[in-house]
Amino acid sequence: MVLKVVYYKKREKNQTLDDITNNESINNTNEYDLSDDSDLSYIIESYDDQNEEETEETNDDAVKLLKDIRKSFTNTEELKEDEFKDNNIVFSFQNYLFGVNKEHNIFNLQNRITLDDKILDYPTEPYSNTNSNFFNTRSINNNSSTFNNDDSNNSIIRESRNFSNQMNISEISSDKQIDSNINTLIEMQRDSTKFSAEITKTISKLNNTLNTINQNQVVLHKTIESHFIKITESLNYLIQPQQQQQQQQQQQQQQQQQQQQQQQQQQQQQQQQQPQHNNNNTQVQPPPPSQQLPPPPKPQPQLPKPQPQKPQPQLPKPPQQPKPPQEPQPDLTSLLKPKIKKQPPKEQQQEQQQQPPQEQQQQQPQEQQQQQQQQQQQQQQQQQQQQQQQQQPQEQQQQQQEPQHKTTTTTTQNNYHNNNNNNTTTPTTRTRFTTTNLH
């Protein structure tokens, strides 16, 4: 198994990637047989400027990996594609990439593997697609250039170079396909980004429209409220005069009713007071009975109120007890007749009463009218009380006088009726009770 290694010069600090990949930077190219373990010592010798311990650890890891690769390629029967499930088997060594590419059929190279060297700026740049199989080393001992320079090795090198050239042609075509696929993926990503940008734009537009709708709703609510307030104010302005007119009309009606009531009361008072003001000499003939109206009740002269007598035990009065002289009480009918004659008819009363016109009465202030009404009511109440007081002593006198003037006479008649059938006589008695009032 042959390992092809391309040696580069040591990379300096300020050296760029393009400077390193130039042809001038290539130092030497050698091929090694991986079957011999001693060859690996020349390949994996390297150093680290910062820490030597880390280089030893990483060198050990790299040696193990290379040994595993050598074992897998020595026996062709044991080689399987399932061992390399991923597209690339990549490992890092001294901050550079090492890898074996599966897509270019590395397994079918007749147990020969070619590892072309290419230095990369790891991890900013990926490994190169120009060469399918590569093995990167940072620095290798220059003494290895004098190793294995016999003719057999030269023939193997020629064969491997020819085969590698043939493979490079197929690799270039496959690389083009890969690049095209990558470009399509990039275009798809761009399209997806464009589509996502369009989606975000549409979402932003929708959000803006929603915000404008909400603002318009708020403005509409405010305008509706303002219009509603204006409508209510206008309605109130229209309704208030009507209500005022109705109130004024009601007040006028109430005033008219009060004035009518006052006029009626004044007329009644004047009718009651007119016979007192008439002269005693003037006598007016009463109207005929057809036109005669019932006179209004007049107040009777006030009598001293009888003191309430205490109940005394009633004793049998002697029959011949002297009675106090009582004045003969005049008959009520006789008292009423001359008064009825003196009352003039209703028409004459209205003529004699000098009433002020209604205009003058209406001009009087309402306070005087109210005072007059109160006085009239008080007078009427006093008159009613006087009448009740007068009626009470009269009833008492009548109750006292009735038992003294009443006399009862009983007459009995005995009638004997003969029964013709039985020849018997049955007496029947009839009694009569008569009462006479002595005045």
UniProtKB/Swiss-Prot annotation:
Bias (Pro residues) ranges: 285-328
Chain segments carrying region Disordered: 268-439
Top-rank taxon: Eukaryota
Classification via InterPro entries: MBLAC1
Segments of skewed composition (Low complexity): 268-284, 350-439
Identification of the protein by name: Putative uncharacterized protein DDB_G0294196
